[in-house]
UniProtKB/Swiss-Prot annotation:
<protein>
    <recommendedName>
        <fullName>Probable chorismate pyruvate-lyase</fullName>
        <ecNumber>4.1.3.40</ecNumber>
    </recommendedName>
</protein>
<dbReference type="InterPro" id="IPR028978">
    <property type="entry name" value="Chorismate_lyase_/UTRA_dom_sf"/>
</dbReference>
<dbReference type="InterPro" id="IPR007440">
    <property type="entry name" value="Chorismate--pyruvate_lyase"/>
</dbReference>
<feature type="binding site">
    <location>
        <position position="74"/>
    </location>
    <ligand>
        <name>substrate</name>
    </ligand>
</feature>
<comment type="function">
    <text>Removes the pyruvyl group from chorismate, with concomitant aromatization of the ring, to provide 4-hydroxybenzoate (4HB) for the ubiquinone pathway.</text>
</comment>
<feature type="binding site">
    <location>
        <position position="113"/>
    </location>
    <ligand>
        <name>substrate</name>
    </ligand>
</feature>
<keyword id="KW-0456">Lyase</keyword>
<feature type="binding site">
    <location>
        <position position="175"/>
    </location>
    <ligand>
        <name>substrate</name>
    </ligand>
</feature>
<keyword id="KW-0963">Cytoplasm</keyword>
<dbReference type="GO" id="GO:0006744">
    <property type="term" value="P:ubiquinone biosynthetic process"/>
</dbReference>
<dbReference type="GO" id="GO:0008813">
    <property type="term" value="F:chorismate lyase activity"/>
</dbReference>
<keyword id="KW-0670">Pyruvate</keyword>
<comment type="similarity">
    <text>Belongs to the UbiC family.</text>
</comment>
<comment type="pathway">
    <text>Cofactor biosynthesis; ubiquinone biosynthesis.</text>
</comment>
<dbReference type="GO" id="GO:0005829">
    <property type="term" value="C:cytosol"/>
</dbReference>
<keyword id="KW-0831">Ubiquinone biosynthesis</keyword>
<dbReference type="GO" id="GO:0042866">
    <property type="term" value="P:pyruvate biosynthetic process"/>
</dbReference>
Length: 189
């Protein structure tokens, strides 16, 4: 699905142009947090933002929101052995801020969201989509700012996203793979 405003195209599978070592990261439907933890000695989450904010046009479209509708945003860096490996952005529309999602959101703190999502059997994940996100997308610049000069970004980042559903309500989770992800071993430690 092409989104002209940001230039990216979200695909069901990574194209052949995606780096071979990155494809399993883009397509594994299991917990990204668990996958990273199995490949590093120390794992951490650095919360960058957890507040109300505006959405990108493609986030609004995916969640069926009108222009100007706001949402709660959670932006974090996933850290493996002291290196940021993923910039993640979670979106919870204001109209979805009831019940289970709101309790989870308020209580998550600096814990990884993935651990909570995959531990609740009531939560269902919709299929993953992936895209190559470049400088035309605001989220690329959010990732760059989050790194605060700790690493140089390539001209585009591979990302994946999916919607999680709980009692008919949606939470969008997007994960942007930073260059250091390829420094993790292919196989678990």
């Amino acid at each position: 699905m092409q989104h002209p405003a940001s230039g990216e195209s979200w695909l069901a599978r990574p194209p052949r142009t995606a780096e071979r070592r990155l494809r399993p990261w883009l397509t594994d439907p299991a917990s990204l947090t668990a996958r990273i933890r199995m490949r590093c000695g120390m794992f951490g989450v650095r919360v960058l933002r957890q507040s109300a904010g505006a959405l990108t046009p493609d986030e609004r479209r995916l969640l069926g929101l009108r222009a100007g509708e706001r949402a709660l945003l959670r932006e974090v860096l996933l850290i493996a052995d002291g290196r940021p490996v993923v910039f993640a952005r979670s979106v919870l529309a204001q109209r979805e801020q009831r019940g289970g999602w709101l309790r989870l959101w308020r209580g998550i703190g600096s814990r990884p969201l993935g651990a909570a999502l995959f531990s609740d059997p009531r939560i269902r994940r919709q299929p993953l989509a992936c895209a190559r996100i470049g400088a035309a997308d605001a989220r690329y610049h959010l990732a760059r700012r989050a790194l605060a000069g700790a690493a140089t970004l390539p001209p585009a980042l591979w990302a994946r996203r999916s919607v999680f559903r709980l009692h008919g309500r949606s939470l969008l989770v997007s994960e942007f793979f930073l260059p250091a992800i390829l420094g993790l071993p292919d196989d678990p430690l």
